[in-house]
Amino acid sequence: LYKADPFAFSAEYRPGTASVTADISGFSWNDSDWISKRSQADMTKQPISIYEVHLGSWKKKDREEKDGYYTYVEAAHELAAYVKEMGYTHVELMGIAEHPYDGSWGYQVTGYFAPTSRYGSPKDFMYFVNYLHKNGIGVILDWVPAHFPKDAHGLADFDGHPLFEYEDPRKGEHPDWGTKVFDYGKNEVKDFLISNALYWVEEYHVDGLRVDAVASMLYLDYGREPGQWVPNKNGGNQNLEAIEFFKHLNTVVQGRNHGVAMIAEESTAWPKVTDHPENDGLGFTFKWNMGWMHDFLEYMKLDPYFRKYNHNRMTFSLTYFTSENYILVLSHDEVVHLKCSMINKMPGLGEDKFSNLKAGYTFMLGHPGKKLLFMGQDFGQWHEWDEKVSLDWYLAEEESHKKLQEYVRDLLHIYKKYPCLYQLDNDWNGFQWINANDGDRSIFSFIRKDETGKKNLLFVVNFTPVDRPDYRVGVPKRCKLSLLLDNVHGAYKPSQCPTYTSVKSECDGQPYSISYPLGGYGTAIFRF
């Protein structure tokens, strides 16, 4: 039996399984300005809009060809141009560490230190990161310390016995996924994983790691029936060793690399995920807001008539948004396994679907928290994501899809331009409801504020097809409001923004108000 080198820098192109000797020294990096700026910034107060990408299916040289992959070098140029035009600040890459099975999407890793050879060499991947940095785009990697596959050449039973994994199968095997679980109580295993995290950050200059399946690491009974798991020394279901691992991991990575984001995909209500370890937190920079995602999608899928009975699905997340540093995510997991693409989740036919999605994305942009959108969902990909084929890029040339794409682009550029949309994401001072209770008409209005409290944006979003030609919305002071964007025109040119002046007329508990013609599925963002 031949095993791959756990520390190999490169691997054979699948289905080959051998490790490949690779020299990763000597690459000519020229992203020092980017790294310096990153190290001085507080990421929680920066605009972060993430484009989640699976390189193997983002674009292909032949859409239907099994491989037909762009190389890291080719993808760097294509992807940077697209991301820059759209206004995303970061890309998050799935499946970069070497993995044998395409259908795992890169979440069953056999080569933790090897960029997958599907797209080129280690230095090709360095080129990718360097090129994106030169274009002002950050790079985040999916990282999988939760489990590893049982492939014979991988880490499982590495010396003929459990070595990297827990020996007791009640802790060392994940029944749902058929994979092995790392033994977080072994110093050697913890060092292996932490050195791997540092390797990607320090050797490849990546700007963050999105840690996959955190909940499966935190709970000993995750995915297990009674009798299939072992309680901790206190009789509880918390994996105390994994908790200490996270605290140590985040302290080391962020202590050595200020400005690098550690992001938790944590699907439960585990407390203090993004708090400091000295406060008994796990020490992550951000946490995916899975609760918001679930409530948002359940609401958006409803026929507009029934939305008034589910109004709280859109307001509930605004009761806890300060509890963590959140990222609002519409990820790959939501557009696979018969869940439908984002556009096909929307009710109605034809243009109604596009109008619904524009309204949903506008609400998402205004909601506190950083943003993540999976590839294809910004232009309305009809099909669910399939890792075997390219996105349907021809759709972006069709009018409805192109208008949706341009609308998302306008939203993202507004997001980067106005600090009120990102400076106070987990601070009550950064958000103010104007009307959270207009459930009968399914209209939401709220204000986002910057640190000065003087440069604000007012959002109004209508989630029904009913026109409101004289919709009155409260405003806290006498002022002029400039309409930056609506669902009909997209973003207005600065010199062409329609203006409205608030009048002394109480509305929504505010002393002033404006009247605005709010169309069906209408959206409006005002600056004041």
Question: In which residue ranges do the predicted regions lie?
Answer:
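Carbohydrate-interacting/catalytic domains
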Residues: 1-46, 72-87, 351-354, 365-373, ...
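Core domains of carbohydrate- and sulfate-ester-processing enzymes
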Residues: 1-39, 135, 154-167, 302-318
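Hydrophobic faces of well-ordered beta-strands that scaffold small-molecule active sites
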Residues: 49-53, 91, 139-141, 209, ...
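Active-site-proximal helices and loops of the catalytic beta/alpha 8
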Residues: 131-135, 158, 162-167, 173, ...
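Active-site core of glycosidic bond-cleaving carbohydrate-active enzymes
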Residues: 317-342, 359
